[in-house]
Regions:
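Polybasic low-complexity intrinsically disordered regions
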Residues: 1-91, 96-100, 148-149
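Basic, amphipathic alpha-helical segments enriched in Lys/Arg and hydrophobic/aromatic residues
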Residues: 78, 82, 107-158
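Short gly/pro/ser/thr-enriched loop/turn and capping motifs at secondary-structure boundaries
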Residues: 102-105
């Protein structure tokens, strides 16, 4: 999943996310079923979610050969599913789209696996440094997110 955040005025890569009306950057997270971050990519907010997901999923072959199923929300349906089938056909990787139920529009319904990455974004929002992107380089932004995730994991162990 992705999250759009504003950037500070000192420069760096930025773009406009028209859907969320944010001038800044997007953070894409790949998390496991516990909500622990496996991979993070930060880029301009002008890049669509499906294209940003390709940046995240392109690393799967090298680093995460043990993954078999990836849960994504409805925003990633369509061409991304076909792209994964073409890119990694022999690995047995499956992209499962978890769609919202339109039956209960006005009620909250907990959908399986959809809330895991949202919960991770909620955990990361506790860190003031991540409320806005203060870093000049996107690589530095990724490192700050991984540091925050490390602190969260260490707090669970304690």
């Amino acid at each position: 999943d992705s999250q759009s955040v504003k950037v500070s005025n000192h420069g760096g890569v930025r773009g406009y996310d028209a859907g969320k009306k944010v001038l800044g950057r997007k953070r894409h997270l790949l998390v496991d079923t516990l909500g622990l971050i496996l991979h993070v990519v930060v880029h301009s907010a002008a890049i669509q979610d499906r294209d940003g997901a390709r940046l995240v999923l392109s690393i799967l072959q090298q680093r995460f050969g043990w993954l078999r199923c990836i849960f994504v929300d409805g925003g990633y349906a369509g061409t991304l599913v076909d792209w994964v089938k073409q890119l990694l056909p022999r690995r047995g990787l499956r992209l499962q789209v978890v769609k919202r139920s339109d039956a209960g529009k006005h009620r909250f319904k907990l959908l399986p696996r959809r809330w895991v990455v949202e919960r991770t974004f909620g955990w990361l929002s506790k860190f003031r440094r991540l409320s806005k992107d203060y870093e000049f380089r996107t690589e530095s932004s990724e490192a700050v997110i991984l540091i925050a995730a490390t602190r969260l994991m260490l707090a669970r162990l304690a």
